[in-house]
């Protein structure tokens, strides 16, 4: 394809200083943008309103919109969303359209190419066209509210937008469908893993690749999947792979290519102290979810909304509570295509015949540069991702089609559902977003998997499939009646933490990769133990116990491991021998509590890092190379080869150290790692092990990955963290690299039907994305102190939660 060279591989986004400099937000500069913060009191006339609307704010800035009509409430929601998060809304729209370079410059071109291949704009147009006239009216009214803000503040935009030189276009109703499509796209996993698998195949070879791609602890190796790559020379046939991997890694860093780490839980009356149901959710996203409450004469709802989309995605309406978590869906596939170029014509091989690829011209407007014009090509499997012209293989991105989809209407209907039965009716029709919906009313709870999942004729979709062989094509989609669901289970609870939610051999495939099972196992332990209330659910969300530590002990003591490990330790040099024995004894005594002040937690995690490096770095290094980065990156997305080898795979070829003449086995590598963990601890934490603390190694770092409105570029001092990637209080790190962790936009919600006002919400992001606002960074302090906010639905309680100060929006002339 005609495409300029990609920029070199970047491990992470720009540093905080670079970002803040680009956006003009550093230090006192925000003071000059104080008039970009909308007022919270007074009167503002707005054209488009029929009657007066009241907007009150609570102590965290969350709005209560009171109106006599739903029309005016939607208009005001658009105005409020834009006032709080216009930069995020603009960035999400540009990202979804493949136009981010207009805001960010040439560094975003590779992201734009990838997003134009996904063609979310076309998907959004289809979904909007299929929406009901009622929903289209809702989106039109909401768009007018957003545009009322854009007109009023056209010369007083937040600093990031104002200094960029980009002038936001007015909001269109279809843009809200586009925001939903981007949200749905981010719920699917495996695209980044497929690209990483190709990178790993180049380094390790297809013969060893299956060992690096486990699906779940009890799943066999995907050897038949790996066979699809045999006979291919990826380095020469797919020369653009490193650049593609770098572009997708940018999106993965922002949690845009699958975002594990969410969890939700519903407990029935028999598991509740009050005798009434409870619901809890914990989500992580690439963007801030904004708390909001709407109260009209015929419609009331409170919960978490996504600015740009006038629908509450998780919340409570006085009768029903609902939330969602990532189902870890694999409903996207890459297809390898054999390419042949003759002059300006590009053809691809399909079942023995060369077919012309459909060409379309794309123009990229780039901030500070001339427009870039390129040609993209479509095959029967989707759009080809950009490759140099000498590539003999291409990668086509195949995504589900959603003609006739009712997801947008169904999501709105969910916010009006009064019971679990109606919630099932609504969520079964959400086919465009693959999530675990969990919902509750006072006496009942339910779970429904939504989405659209391809039927693959052959293969699992774990690796790119040969597009020239129709055996691997999709054959329609799984019957929605096969989608997993449950209602009022005998156990009395329903919970999901991105684990495999289907038994092996089930009649449809949701995914081939799942997150570490220990989070869901711990959730089951806590949910199934005794009775609960909102306080115990808050404690559950903050739980820092890992069950992986106990599995590690069982592995050490297994009949086939205990004696060989002892012999391997005995064979170490004297100094290492004592360290290994000491480490082993400490790990066997460790209770799995990953408190930030725990010395044993520090030693345990040092061992995890050491054994990963001792096992794989000789094959996949150097550390700065694309293979090691892909390997470490995969461990953040799903159950990893690091964990799989730690607990099993005794016959793996990766146990042998290629840098030594002898052949090592698993006990030998474990013995080295036990000694190495102690040595690393002494080097990093000092010789006095009484002063060791996990939180001295494992720290929140700011800013979290952020990019031109996608995430808030807040800078603050590092903070000690507990937990890890296997705990309910999720603090993942790069397994095989370092212990740093980040806090993306996160939100927790608890609904306790036993309380007079059931709904409580906590977000790590401030209500505002504007650095000049008092509510830009205050979410972090509330998050770390566990300071939930109550969103009451009874009018007599509004004053206590929101006060009496209000902004009155009145019809303008």
Curated annotation (Swiss-Prot):
Heterodimer of an alpha subunit and a beta subunit processed from the same precursor. This is Acyl-homoserine lactone acylase QuiP. The keyword Hydrolase applies. Catalyzes the deacylation of acyl-homoserine lactone (AHL or acyl-HSL), releasing homoserine lactone (HSL) and the corresponding fatty acid. Possesses a specificity for the degradation of long-chain acyl-HSLs (side chains of seven or more carbons in length). Keywords: Hydrolase, Periplasm, Quorum sensing, Signal, Zymogen. The active site is at 262 (nucleophile). It is found in: Periplasm. It comes from Pseudomonas putida (strain ATCC 47054 / DSM 6125 / CFBP 8728 / NCIMB 11950 / KT2440). Its main location: periplasm. Belongs to the peptidase S45 family. Its EC number is 3.5.1.97. One of its GO terms (biological process) is antibiotic biosynthetic process. The lineage of its organism: Bacteria, Pseudomonadati, Pseudomonadota, Gammaproteobacteria, Pseudomonadales. The gene is quiP. InterPro entries: Ntn_hydrolases_N, Pen/GL7ACA/AHL_acylase, Penicillin_amidase_A-knob, Penicillin_amidase_dom1, Penicillin_amidase_N_B-knob, S45. It catalyses: an N-acyl-L-homoserine lactone + H2O = L-homoserine lactone + a carboxylate.
